[in-house]
């Protein structure tokens, strides 16, 4: 299992690969070479599953097969583990920060998603809610970029959306459409759409329809099928352009471009690139948050690759 996460404010990114260590890399200023700047060897006792930078770039969250979450603080270029969050009963599969940085979401094989709140004056994290709406493993959690709304994907083939109600969190929508495990999710920059990918080799684009403050529903407006030969393990929708990248079990990366956002988005979608990227399953893709043509991929072949996507694609 490999993961990558670009630092939100600059070009360095972090990677961990096949173990319990986190490696932080930076691009050399005078070349296209990358240098490992730091290796974080403490914190976890088993393989790390996911990592995420806070929006400010000063904190890093990691989660592991050891059922814990570590919060790392960056000071003077060095990182130290400032908190270990415990509560999940099994491996923690994904962590993700809200756009405000106040909330951190985690999900686990124990069928739950947790919301942790950062108490700034105490520099501590408290559990704000435990969400147990899924009937199987929760594979992925992601926050809307525009509001405190959380979305989760599960082995039970469903997607769930959570909102804060009276200082607690509850499931407001259950989305059904995938025929097998939903592996990953990624929002469009507007927060009005997101894309999901699944074991059924399908991408789906979902749109929020609002007819009033309390009258909200999510509908599937596009199903992208026939392009992938194996399960799609990850998807990332660039916040700088309308390109969607996928990581597939057939060792390949595919890129789609949305020409225009409409209710019939399938008529505005172009399949623009295919890369036989790795020698094994590709399990992660990430667009750079500040450079619109840079994409990173990670694979079970123990490699991370950085791609420059040309504008003519």
Curated annotation (Swiss-Prot):
GO cellular component: cytosolic [4Fe-4S] assembly targeting complex
Tagged with keyword Transmembrane: no
Superkingdom of the source species: Eukaryota
First and last residues of every WD repeat: 1-35, 43-82, 87-126, 133-172, 177-216, 227-266, 277-313
Listed CDD domains: WD40 (cd00200)
Family: Belongs to the WD repeat CIA1 family.
HAMAP family reported in the protein's UniProt record: ciao1
Free-text function comment from the UniProt entry: Essential component of the cytosolic iron-sulfur (Fe/S) protein assembly machinery. Required for the maturation of extramitochondrial Fe/S proteins.
Record's protein name: Probable cytosolic iron-sulfur protein assembly protein CIAO1 homolog
Organism per entry: Trichoplax adhaerens
Record lineage: Eukaryota, Metazoa, Placozoa, Uniplacotomia, Trichoplacea
């Amino acid at each position: 299992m490999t993961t990558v996460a670009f630092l939100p404010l600059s070009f360095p990114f972090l990677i961990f690969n096949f173990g319990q260590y986190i490696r932080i890399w930076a691009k050399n200023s005078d070349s296209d070479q990358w240098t490992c700047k730091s290796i974080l060897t403490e914190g976890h006792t088993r393989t790390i599953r996911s990592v995420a930078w806070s929006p400010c770039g000063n904190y890093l969250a990691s989660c592991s097969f050891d059922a814990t979450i570590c919060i790392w603080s960056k000071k003077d270029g060095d990182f130290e583990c400032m908190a270990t969050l415990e509560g999940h009963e099994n491996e923690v599969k994904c962590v993700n920060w809200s756009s405000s940085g106040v909330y951190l979401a985690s999900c686990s094989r124990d069928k739950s998603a947790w919301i942790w709140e950062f108490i700034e004056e105490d520099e501590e994290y408290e559990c704000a809610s435990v969400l147990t709406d899924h009937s199987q493993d929760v594979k992925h959690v992601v926050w809307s970029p525009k509001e405190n709304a959380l979305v989760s994907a599960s082995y039970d083939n469903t997607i769930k959306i959570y909102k804060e109600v009276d200082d607690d969190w509850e499931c407001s929508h259950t989305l059904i459409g995938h025929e097998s495990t939903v592996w990953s999710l990624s929002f469009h920059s507007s927060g009005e759409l997101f894309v999901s990918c699944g074991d059924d080799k399908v991408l789906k684009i979902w749109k929020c329809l609002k007819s009033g403050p309390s009258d909200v529903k999510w509908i599937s407006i596009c199903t992208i099928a026939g392009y992938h030969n194996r399960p799609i393990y990850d998807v990332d929708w660039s916040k700088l352009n309308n390109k969607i990248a996928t990581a597939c079990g057939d060792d390949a990366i595919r890129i789609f471009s949305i020409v225009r956002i409409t209710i019939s988005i399938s008529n505005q979608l172009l399949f623009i690139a295919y890369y036989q990227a790795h020698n094994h399953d590709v399990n992660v893709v990430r667009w750079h948050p500040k450079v619109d043509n840079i994409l990173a991929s990670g694979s079970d072949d123990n490699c991370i690759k950085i791609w420059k996507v040309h504008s003519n694609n």
